[in-house]
Amino acid sequence: MTTPISPTQPASIAYDDAPLTRFHIRIAVAGTGGQFSDGFILGIIGIVIAAAGDTLGLTPLWTGALGAATLTGLFAGAIAVGPVADRIGRRWIFGWDMLFFAVLSLLQFFVQTPGQLLTLRLLLGLVLGADYVVSKSLVTEHSPRKFRGRLMSLLAVAWAAGYVFAYLIGFLLTGHGDNAWRYMLAISALPALLVFGFRLGVPESPLWLARHRRDAEAADVVRRHLGPGVLPPTAPPLSQHRGFTALFGPAYRRRTGVGALFYVCQVIPFFALGTFSSQVMEALGVTSKMGAGALYNVFLLIGAVVGLLLIDRISRRRFLVGTFFIGAALLTVLILFADAGASAIVVIGLFAAFAFLMSAAVNLEFVYPPELFPTDLRASGVGIATAASRLGSAASTFLLPVVEAGHGIDTALVGCVVILLVGGLVCWVWAPETSTESLLDTDLAPTSG
């Protein structure tokens, strides 16, 4: 790991080309708390639904609604907080949102009705939507260009770790009394509380400060944390057209569309199959649902780590397009083999391979959207992409059990294949390459379309 520049060395290194320091890693690790918590509460809900069904009197409608509740809250939180974070900054939202998350997580322990749990899941989603926006923006803006992909991918690994940890907690607590599901829900407060104190000392983004003409503050952050050898960022004045007006205007509408569509097409099959993996395995004829789920989650975590290792070795476009088309092919083969009566080992293996691939691709959800937009639109742009994806995910987790019950698992899986193909085609035609772009250049030069 590179250390900061010597105090005797004159400032000569561009902010975006600064060497990697402990400060950068600390910022990235601080950003992982919300992602771990998000992965956990989204991963645990399927297990909780199965365990609390009788106690809460869950109908198929309540099951679908609870599966989609957090995602729906994420939609609202991301789209509402994005413009706010672009106007007031990232630091304070980033510092305090995990405390609210911890309180809401603990309240889940005391729910008595499906409606109470639904309300808390929606509120948790709102907080996580805010955290998605500010975490991705803040970590991106603090990261040197050369290491940005890997630092942002730490957030993806944290998300996968939270998702897998949820499965482990569910496995350990299932069968330990009628209230075991309450502990499954409340335990998500622990990582949020751990990261809360760690975040309070994180400084504001120098890029955001410079963009808002607070140059002295930006220079002070750079000097204190990166040393005098790194030049503070400079930025043009704020555009007259900001927020959603600019995002859907001629300069950025293509990037806004690509950011939203790739995200939607990636997470719909990921969340639909992940949330109800046990039910999917049962419908495909696999009797060892717990073993299948364990393998699925192991490959989920491995995929996220492999994605981190690959993210700066493969162009963003190649990673995007390739994982969409390969994912569609894997899922098609899975359907055909399952229909042909393939053994459980083959079906589970294909499902695990799909989980591995999609989890590796999830790294792009953390790296790519923040790179598409300039600093004064970054949180809003990430908010639009996140909101669109969570709306699609909420719909898919609500509809998958309904479609599977009415038309069979093949119909649900074929729908996922179609969505993956659409995502691949959209990225093939319109996705720009961002891995070599400086964030300073993105601020200075509006893109076309």
Place the predicted regions along the sequence by residue:
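Transmembrane-helix signature of 12-pass secondary carriers
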Residues: M1-G449
